[in-house]
Amino acid sequence: MTTWLLLVVCLGIACQGITSVTVRENSPRKLANSMNVIHEWKYLDYDFGSDERRQAAMQSGEYDHTKNYPFDVDQWRGMTFVTVPRYKGVPSSLNVISEKIGNGGRLLQPYPDWSWANYKDCSGIVSAYKIAIDKFDRLWILDSGIINNTQPMCSPKLHVFDLNTSHQLKQVVMPHDIAVNASTGNGGLVSLVVQAMDPVNTIVYMADDKGDALIVYQNSDESFHRLTSNTFDYDPKYIKMMDAGESFTAQDGIFGMALSPMTNNLYYSPLSSRSLYYVNTKPFMKSEYGANNVQYQGVQDIFNTESIAKIMSKNGVLFFGLMNNSAIGCWNEHQPLQRENMDMVAQNEETLQTVVAMKMMHLPQSNKMNRMHRMNRVNRVNRMDRMDRIDRMDRMDRMDTMDTMDRIDRMDRMDRIDRIDRMHTMDTMDTMDRTDKMSSMDRMDRMDRVDRMDTMDRTDKMSSMDRMDRMDRVDTMDTMDTMDRMDRMDRMDRMDRMDRMDTMDRTDKMSRIDRMDKIDRMDRMDRTNRMDRMNRMNRQMNEYMMALSMKLQKFINNDYNFNEVNFRILGANVNDLIMNTRCANSDNQNNNQNKHNN
């Protein structure tokens, strides 16, 4: 059965948003062990190809292990992507985790290759913050163009790669008036969400945390829109944050975002805030950006702490990192957006210090599970192919049967027509025979009468002959009238027989049509039942969450201890996470799920 993986990236940096959830005492869930560590690093290192090249990179300042911090993670098939914001000493900003292991952990390989790590002429990938993989196997990369978190090196861009070929499909350079706040001149693109309806009709939402704006990119016409709202601004009350008991200051606006596949709501929070907001994206799909069309909603101060990373499950459960709690919280969007409807699904002060990235995965991390998923998918496809072939054979058999019935009907009609023709011929011959016989008898009668008349007086004979002629004419007319009536009756009988035969033919055709309609309805019902079964199987698929965690305050203060683990990628089954929580399925959710599927 296909599963999804929720990828949570935890950095040794403290996140700033914690929900108002609290861990219930006597809870049967072991929150400390609810997520499994997949990868971990003391520091990030790269596969340079040889020790000589690594030493040369270190001596030139191209690589400095103290300046490399993971910021986002995603997975496609066997590749796990990791982004590293560009600082001096970062050799590559977009990478995949290799099979090679160094002193710090798994080595990173630049994606697609080392040539794209060259940023000085702005032709490569300068500084990748967030990435997203859509359902059409495309990798979207948000390149801020900023190095050292402050210096604009190149114009911000969107890079799009085909993951099947690792070839770039598109590179979109953002206009300056879109990328920065015109009033303050500030700008910093740090987060993106991709909404792909089809390969052309795709929308990308980007968060500008320094310029307090939401940028919308329409792939169909390559247009940009910069949206502003006070819900994007940071809250002055929360610019001083706490992480693992240490405080730091940040004045960042809209940051973490998540898109609901069920309601099309885009959920977001400013980094320096404890509020949760959302906007419905349907107006954006229609290119309606007016104030009357776009409505921003949400609840202020709904969290107990700041929240950075957010992700949405396919069933409408929002997961969010809780900075000062070293935890991950949840809320089911089928419930009212209230503090009491939120809950905590994972908490660990060692492995979940600050969750800076989370992803939902279509496939589990295990290769064995991947193979099982592919085998199940192939078996389902083969079963559907076999059923389609059987349906086609059944239709062909029915068509052959109908052809045979049509041939039999035509032969029956021809036989009936032949019989009618023969009957008509025989009737005609009988009529002629009767007429000949009657004529012969009339002639004999007349001869007899003539003989008798010879013995009679001529006058009497003449009178008698006149009377007889008149009688003969009357008899002949009566005979003709009788024959005409018989012919009319025969014709009426034949017409009645033909009408009855036509009625029988029409009845037979109607019966065949009714049978075919019933068969078609049964076929449609069978196909519908198969689709329903497939939909039920899809709804029953598991999801896996993957998270990236690190110590945020260490990142800001640049005082990591690289002799201990600082960065971790963790994973967990979503159903296991939300089990026995307020975020589990409800009747309201099931009803909304059915409406969404319809």
Swiss-Prot record:
A Pfam match is MRJP
Q: Hey, what's the signal peptide range on this chain?
A: 1-17
Q: Answer whether the UniProt record assigns the keyword Secreted to this protein.
A: yes
What cellular component GO annotations does this protein have? extracellular region
Tissue pattern of expression reads:
Found in and secreted from the hypopharyngeal glands of the worker honey bee (at protein level); expression peaks at 8 days post eclosion. Expressed in the brains of adult worker bees peaking at 12 days post eclosion (at protein level). Expressed in the spermatheca of adult queen bees (at protein level); Expression levels are higher in mated queens than in virgin queens. Expressed in the heads of worker bees after eclosion, expression dropping with age and detectable up to 26 days of age.
Give the record's keywords alphabetically. Answer: Glycoprotein, Repeat, Secreted, Signal
Reported induction: Unlike other major royal jelly proteins, not down-regulated by the ecdysteroid 20-hydroxyecdysone (ecdysterone or 20E).
Residues in a coiled coil are none
This protein's source sits in the domain of life called Eukaryota
UniProt xrefs under PANTHER family: GH10609P-RELATED (PTHR10009:SF7), PROTEIN YELLOW-RELATED (PTHR10009)
Q: What does the function comment of this entry state?
A: Component of royal jelly, a substance produced in the hypopharyngeal gland containing proteins, free amino acids, fatty acids, sugars and other nutrients, which is fed to developing larvae by worker nurse bees. Major royal jelly proteins (MRJPs) are high in essential amino acids and probably have a nutritional function in larval food. All larvae are fed some royal jelly (also known as worker jelly) early in their development but it forms the principal source of nutrition for larvae destined to become queen bees.
Q: What family, per the record?
A: Belongs to the major royal jelly protein family.
Quote the protein name from its UniProt record: Major royal jelly protein 5
Which organism is this entry from? Apis mellifera (Honeybee)
> Which gene underlies this protein?
Mrjp5
